[in-house]
Swiss-Prot record:
The GINS complex plays an essential role in the initiation of DNA replication. Has a role in chromosome segregation. It comes from Cryptococcus neoformans var. neoformans serotype D (strain B-3501A) (Filobasidiella neoformans). The keyword Nucleus applies. Transmembrane segments: none annotated. It holds the Pfam family Sld5. GO terms for biological process: chromosome segregation; double-strand break repair via break-induced replication; nuclear DNA replication. GO terms for cellular component: chromatin; CMG complex; GINS complex; nuclear replication fork. It is found in: Nucleus. SUPFAM superfamilies: GINS helical bundle-like (SSF158573), PriA/YqbF domain (SSF160059). This is DNA replication complex GINS protein PSF2. Keywords: Chromosome partition, DNA replication, Nucleus.
Amino acid sequence: MALPKTLHPALTPDELAFLAEHDHISIVPLFSMTRVRLISGIYGPFRPPSASRVPLWLGLSLKKKRKCRIVPPEWLSAERLQAFLRDEKENSEGFERLPRRFMEISKVLLDIASDDLSQPTLLRSLLKDIREVRQAKIRMGLQSEDVLQNDYLQVMPFSSLCPVALRRHLTRYGIGDQSHSLGTV
């Protein structure tokens, strides 16, 4: 059963992943080429084994064609994710600061470039644990206003909440009404 438009979240997880593809990552090209001029900018030169910075969408496209290896962001390692998880669990008052578009970039890299990542199964598990801890905090925050006002709450965990529960919470605090679209809150 499809939800009415007023109960749809502002952005779907796929739309958030699309937006994250504009962030830059490092790649190690498996080909040689001088600079390439695209609408979004000039990238290159591409000379193996030197790393190049490109938008995530370009890195993913080259990866699918087996033209590069993606260098994972420094925060996408088992040690860093374990530290994020530990800090998130210890901070019961709010949310820990995570890198920009943390969940979206992680998901895309694990889906397309898992062979370039160290211990992808462990990374998936840690990311799931972090997401679950944050979602539990959000659910608890639906009882009070405080958690929802935290600056470090990222879009993806918030957008994955049940739209009906989110609508009920927003209405309770006078932030929206039944005719108000979630996309404009």
